[in-house]
A protein has these predicted regions:
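Basic, Lys/Arg-enriched alpha-helical interface segments
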Residues: 1-56, 61-126, 397
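Positively charged, polyanion-binding regions of nucleic-acid-associated proteins
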Residues: 791-832, 837-839
C-alpha cells in the first residue's frame, strides 16, 4: 500500500525504526510491523504499529477509488497514549489491543474524494485532506491574499490549514454562525493545539458584538417584508426585494458613511438598481426604515457597522474572511480595521453565489486596499476552479449557466471569470420534469421519507405552494439553502414562476455562444445597461440552488419549453429516476438538530411536528416550577401524607441538597431524612441506573417517543444523566443523534457540569471515563458579556476549564457546611477538585497553584491586563467569586439571550436550600448584580414566624412604665398602626 504522512508528523527521534516500519507497511506486512487495532477509540479506525520496545506509531487507512493507503499520524513515545493528540483522552490498554491483517483493516478504510498522484503530505481536519496543485500553491502563498473559488472547491479547508501557521491573536469571520462554528470544530478536530495562537471563530454578528453588543435583534428580510407591506400604499412603484438590496447594498453600505440624499441621487448608472427619478422615493423609504428599526427593537448590521467604526480598535494579528461575498463594503472595512498590521488577511469567496442583498463586487473589495499603494502592490488573487462536492453532470450544468450569464451580461469582474472543474468523481443525474400531478406525486413519494432529498424554491413566499405537492419538511428558499448540501435536490418552479425574468436573462444568447470551454473576460456592450444588477439575483439563485445537489438534480417546471432549458440542453423526462434511502427516526433527529444549529428553525420544527411527533413524558418533572410547588405543599400548606416529602427527599439526594433533607426532618417531621448522609448515594443511583447499563435500547426508545431533550423526573436530559452515570457509549449514541450539549437544568448546569461533579468526587471516575466524556460533551466555547461587549471563552483557553469548574461547584459554596463563610473560591478548593484529573483534561502546567492564582488574578475586575476578561470579583484576599456584572449567553434551541450570571446560576433558588449563615452573603451578591432580594426560604417560613412571635412576646413582657418617653413612643406606634389598618380597610 502507498504510504502517506500527516504534515505534522515528527519521526526525528526514531528515524531508522520508522523507515523499517514504513517498508513493512508498504508491502502490506502487518505482522512484521506488529500492527494492532485500537478497539476502544470512538473517533475513527486507528491502528498502532511497533517501532521499538518503548515507542509506537499511530496510523489510519484511507482509500481513494481502488488505491489503499496508510496515513502515518503520530509517534507515541514510551507507551504514553494519554498525551496523544489523535486519541483525545481515550484510555488504551495495550494488553487488550488486537492484532489485525492488512486485508481486514482495508475493509474499514476511510474513503477520500481526492488524492494527489505524487505528493504524500496530508492535512488533517475532521478527515484527511490532500491538496491539488492550485490549493498547494495558495497554501504556500504569503498574505495578503484573496482566494476565489466555487462551492465545494475546498476554500474553507485551505484557509483553516493556512491559519494554523499564524501566531498571535487571529480572527476567522463569516456571515453564517453555523459556518463559523463548523470551521472552529474543523480547526480543532483531531486534538489540534497551537500554544502561541489565540483564535476566534465568529459570525459577523458576533464580530459586531465583540466590539459592542447592539440592543435588540438583527432585522431580517422577513421583518423588512412585513414592514414594507404596510408602506406599500405610499411606494407602489417599488419592488420589496430590490428596495431591500438597495438599502443594504448601496445606501447603507458605503465605507465613508451612510449616503446622504444628494450623494445617493448623484450615483452613476451602474452604481444603483434604480433610475434617478426613482431614487427620491427610495430614499424616503430608507428614512422611514431607519426610524422604524429602534421603534421595534431591531437593528441593521450595516448601520451598526457605520456606528461601530469609531469603536473598533486594532486587535488581531491576522484575519480570515470566509464567504466574503456575503458582506457589504462597510462590513468588510470594519473587520479590516481591527488588524494590527495592514495586509495580514486572507479573503475568500465566490461572487456567483451572491443571494444576499449587498451589491458585492471584487473590484469594490480591492478598492479598499488601493488607498494604500504598498498594500495594493502586495495583494494577490488566486482562483480555485476544482469542485469536489457536485457530480460531474451538475458541474457541467452550472458551467453552462455561467456561460449564459457571461454572454448576456458580460463578465461580472475578472476575478469571477472562470468555470468549475468537477473533481468529485460522481456521474450524477439531472432531469427536467413537468409540473403535473403524476410527476410531483412520484417525486413526493420518493423524497418525503428521506433526509438526503430537499425541495428548493426561489423565495420564501414560494414555499407554501411547494408544500402542497411535497410532504417533506425539507423545503427551503434559496436564501435558506445557502450552505446546505443534499444528495438529491428538487428545484420547484424556479423558472416557470419567473418566466419573464429568465426570458430576459437568455435574450440574445444562442447555443453556439456556449461552445467555448473557457470564459474570456469582456465587459457588457452597453455601460448604461443595468440588467445584471436587476437580474443578478435570479441567475445567481439558480446557480446556488443547482450546486446544493451532491449527486442528483430534478427541475420541476410548468413551462418546460422555456428557452433557458434549451440552452441548458435539458429535455423533458417522462418519469423521475430517483432512488432515496428511507430515513430512520434517528436520521430525522440528527437532521433536526443540524438544521437548528444552522438557524433553520422552521424546517427543524416541521420535522419534530410531522415526523418525530414527540409526546411529553408521563412522569412529573421536578424542574424549578415543580420544585417550588412541592415546597409550598409540604412546608407552607402542610398537605397530609408523605408522597410530596418523598419526592423532595429524592430530589435532595439527586441534587445534593443536605439542607433540604434537614428541613424535611425538622420542619416536616419526615424521619427518613435523618439518614440522608447514609442514603444519598443509593437514592441518587436509583434515578441513574437505566443510564448506567451497557444495553440502553430502552433509553433510545424513550428518546424516539419523547425527544432527545426530554426531561427525567429529576430534570436531567438523557445526555446529562448518561454523563453523570459515566456511560461513554450512551453519550456517544446520544451525541450522534444530535443531543444538545448546551441543554441545562434549573441551576444552569449542563452535561459537562454533571460529569465534572462526578469526577471531582471520585478519583476513579476522573481517570476514566471522564477524559472520554470531556471530549464528547464539553461545549466549544462560553459566551460572556463584559462591559457591553462579547467575550468568547474558547475551550482551549485556561479560563474555560476554570470557569466550568466554578460553575459546577457554585451551588455548593452556599449549601455545604464544610465551606468557608465567604461563599467563594480559593485556589486550594480548585486544586483539590482537580487532583485526580489526567493531563489530557487539565495540562500539568495548568494544574498548579501559581498558574491558577495567575489566571484568577489576571481576570479580576479592574485588573490592568491586556487580555483581562473580567470574569471574577475578589471577595477578600485569595477568595474569588463570579463578577456580579457578568452576563452569559444562554441558548434554547435557535434562541439565545443574555442573562446575568447569578440569574443563570439561579442564585434565588439556591437561596431556598442555603445554610442560614450563607443567606446574608447571597443577599449581598444579588444586590451587587442588581437582582431582586429573596424572601424567607419556604421551608423556614413557619420557624421565622414563630421566632417573630416569640420576640414580640418577649418585647411585650418588658413594656416600659407608663408616662416614660419610651411608653409614649410605643403608644404612638400602636395608634399609627391602627390608623393605617383603618385606611387600608376603607380603600
Amino acid at each position: 500500500m502507498r504510504i502517506l504522512e500527516y504534515v505534522g508528523l515528527d519521526t526525528s527521534r526514531v528515524t531508522a525504526q520508522y523507515q523499517k516500519l514504513v517498508d513493512a507497511l508498504g508491502r502490506d506486512d502487518f505482522r512484521a510491523a506488529e500492527v494492532k487495532k485500537l478497539v476502544n477509540v470512538s473517533h475513527g479506525k486507528l491502528y498502532r504499529a511497533k517501532l521499538d520496545y518503548a515507542n509506537r506509531l499511530l496510523f489510519c487507512l484511507v482509500r481513494h477509488e481502488t488505491e489503499m493507503c496508510a496515513l502515518m499520524l503520530e509517534v507515541i513515545e514510551n507507551h504514553d497514549y494519554g498525551h496523544s493528540r489523535f486519541l483525545r483522552g481515550a484510555a488504551i490498554d495495550e494488553s487488550r489491543v488486537v492484532a489485525i491483517e492488512a486485508a481486514a483493516a482495508g475493509a474499514e478504510a476511510q474513503s477520500v474524494r481526492y488524492l494527489h498522484p505524487q505528493r504524500t503530505a496530508i492535512h488533517v481536519l475532521d478527515k484527511p485532506i490532500s491538496f491539488d496543485d492550485a490549493q498547494e500553491a495558495i497554501y504556500r502563498q504569503p498574505p495578503p491574499l484573496i482566494v476565489v473559488g466555487s462551492a465545494g472547491s475546498g476554500k474553507t479547508a485551505l484557509t483553516l490549514e493556512k491559519l494554523k501557521h499564524i501566531e498571535g491573536e487571529v480572527l476567522y469571520v463569516t456571515q453564517s454562525a453555523y459556518l463559523a462554528r463548523n470551521a472552529r470544530d474543523l480547526y480543532y478536530a483531531g486534538g489540534f493545539e497551537h500554544e502561541t495562537q489565540e483564535a476566534s471563530f465568529l459570525s459577523y454578528r458576533e464580530f459586531i458584538e465583540s466590539i459592542r453588543v447592539p440592543q435588540g435583534r438583527e432585522a431580517a428580510w422577513r421583518d423588512f417584508r412585513g414592514w414594507f407591506e404596510r408602506q406599500r400604499q405610499a411606494f407602489r412603484d417599488l419592488d420589496a426585494h430590490q428596495a431591500f438590496e438597495e438599502i443594504r447594498g448601496v445606501i447603507a453600505a458605503c465605507v465613508g458613511g451612510v449616503l446622504s440624499r444628494s450623494a445617493y441621487q448623484a450615483l452613476g448608472v451602474r452604481q444603483s438598481i434604480f433610475a434617478p427619478e426613482q431614487r427620491q422615493a427610495l430614499y424616503d423609504l430608507f428614512e422611514r426604515y431607519r426610524a422604524w428599526l429602534p421603534e421595534t427593537g431591531l437593528y441593521d448590521l450595516n448601520l451598526i457597522a457605520q456606528e461601530w467604526a469609531s469603536l473598533a480598535a486594532a486587535r488581531y494579528d491576522f484575519v480570515v474572511v470566509d464567504e466574503v461575498q456575503d458582506l457589504t463594503a462597510v462590513q468588510l472595512a470594519l473587520v479590516l480595521k481591527t488588524l494590527i498590521a495592514p495586509g495580514q488577511f486572507l479573503l475568500c469567496g465566490d461572487s456567483n453565489q451572491i443571494v444576499h442583498p449587498n451589491f458585492f463586487s471584487w473590484s469594490q473589495v480591492k478598492s479598499l486596499f488601493w488607498r494604500e499603494p504598498a498594500l495594493a502592490q502586495r495583494q494577490q488573487l488566486r482562483v480555485l476552479t476544482a469542485n469536489f462536492r457536485n457530480a460531474d453532470v451538475t458541474a457541467q450544468l452550472a458551467n453552462t449557466l455561467l456561460k449564459i450569464k457571461q454572454q448576456r451580461f458580460g463578465s461580472v469582474d475578472r476575478e469571477s471569470n472562470f468555470l468549475i472543474q468537477a473533481g468529485g468523481g460522481e456521474p450524477g443525474r439531472v432531469q427536467l420534469l413537468s409540473d403535473k400531478e403524476s410527476a410531483t406525486r412520484e417525486l413526493d413519494a420518493r423524497t418525503r421519507g428521506s433526509t438526503q432529498a430537499a425541495v428548493l424554491v426561489l423565495r420564501d413566499e414560494d414555499k407554501s405552494e411547494a408544500r402542497k405537492h411535497f410532504a417533506t419538511p425539507l423545503v427551503f428558499s434559496v436564501h435558506e439553502a445557502k450552505g446546505l448540501e443534499y444528495e438529491s435536490i428538487v428545484l420547484y418552479r424556479f423558472v416557470s414562476d419567473h418566466r419573464s425574468e429568465f426570458a430576459e436573462i437568455v435574450a440574445g444568447v444562442a447555443e453556439t455562444d456556449l461552445l467555448l470551454d473557457t470564459l474570456e473576460y469582456r465587459r457588457a456592450r452597453d455601460k448604461g445597461d443595468k440588467s445584471l444588477e436587476i437580474y443578478k439575483f435570479f441567475i445567481n439563485a439558480l446557480y446556488v440552488a443547482m450546486t446544493r445537489a451532491v449527486r442528483n438534480l430534478y427541475l420541476v417546471e410548468a413551462d418546460t419549453q422555456h428557452p433557458l432549458f434549451r440552452l441548458l440542453k435539458l429535455t423533458l423526462s417522462e418519469q423521475a429516476a430517483i432512488e432515496t434511502h428511507q430515513a430512520s427516526l434517528e436520521d430525522w433527529q440528527k437532521e433536526a438538530r443540524k438544521l437548528e444549529l444552522q438557524g433553520k428553525q422552521e424546517q427543524a420544527s416541521a420535522i419534530r411536528n410531522t415526523i418525530l411527533k414527540h409526546t411529553p413524558p408521563p412522569w412529573p418533572v421536578l424542574d424549578e416550577r415543580g420544585l417550588r410547588e412541592s415546597l409550598t405543599r409540604v412546608f407552607r400548606e402542610q398537605v397530609p401524607g408523605d408522597k410530596q416529602k418523598r419526592r423532595l427527599f429524592d430530589y435532595a439526594a439527586c441534587h445534593d441538597e443536605p439542607m433540604l433533607a434537614q428541613h424535611l426532618d425538622r420542619e416536616a417531621d419526615f424521619s427518613p431524612a435523618r439518614g440522608f448522609a447514609q442514603q444519598r448515594a443509593s437514592l441518587a443511583n436509583k434515578y441513574l441506573t437505566p443510564y448506567q447499563a451497557r444495553h440502553f435500547k430502552d433509553i433510545l426508545r424513550q428518546c424516539d417517543l419523547h425527544g432527545l431533550e426530554h426531561r427525567t423526573a429529576m430534570n436531567h436530559t438523557p445526555l446529562m444523566a448518561a454523563a453523570i452515570a459515566g456511560n461513554v457509549a450512551l453519550v456517544e449514541a446520544l451525541i450522534e443523534r444530535g443531543a444538545d450539549r448546551d441543554a441545562s437544568d434549573h441551576y444552569g448546569r449542563n452535561a459537562l457540569h454533571g460529569a465534572l461533579l462526578a469526577a471531582f468526587a471520585d478519583g476513579k471516575f476522573a481517570r476514566s471515563p471522564f477524559p472520554a466524556l470531556y471530549e464528547l460533551i464539553a461545549p466549544a466555547s462560553v459566551d460572556v458579556k463584559v462591559a457591553g461587549r462579547l467575550v468568547r471563552i474558547d475551550r482551549h483557553l485556561s479560563e474555560y476549564f476554570l470557569l466550568q469548574t466554578l460553575w459546577a461547584l457554585f451551588k455548593s459554596r452556599f449549601t455545604h457546611a464544610d465551606r468557608r463563610p465567604y461563599c467563594a473560591f480559593e485556589t486550594a478548593t480548585i486544586l483539590q477538585a482537580w487532583q485526580h484529573l489526567p493531563p489530557s483534561v487539565v495540562r500539568a502546567e495548568r494544574n498548579r497553584r501559581a498558574h491558577l492564582s495567575g489566571v484568577l488574578a489576571r481576570n479580576e475586575i479592574d485588573r490592568d491586563y491586556p487580555y483581562n476578561r473580567a470574569l471574577f470579583a475578589r471577595v477578600t484576599q485569595g477568595w474569588y467569586q463570579f463578577n456580579p456584572a457578568l452576563e452569559i449567553r444562554c441558548r434554547d434551541a435557535d434562541q439565545s439571550a443574555w442573562r446575568p450570571v447569578l440569574a443563570a446560576l439561579n442564585l434565588p433558588l439556591i437561596h431556598e436550600f442555603a445554610l442560614e449563615h450563607s443567606l446574608p452573603r447571597i443577599e449581598s451578591y444579588l444586590a451587587a448584580a442588581g437582582l431582586p432580594s429573596c424572601a424567607v426560604p419556604v421551608a423556614l417560613e413557619r420557624r421565622r414566624a414563630q421566632q417573630q412571635r416569640a420576640a414580640q412576646r418577649q418585647s411585650e413582657s418588658h413594656e416600659p412604665r407608663w408616662g416614660t418617653p419610651q411608653a409614649r413612643q410605643r403608644e404612638m406606634q400602636k395608634l399609627q398602626q391602627r390608623i393605617d389598618a383603618l385606611r387600608k380597610s376603607e380603600t
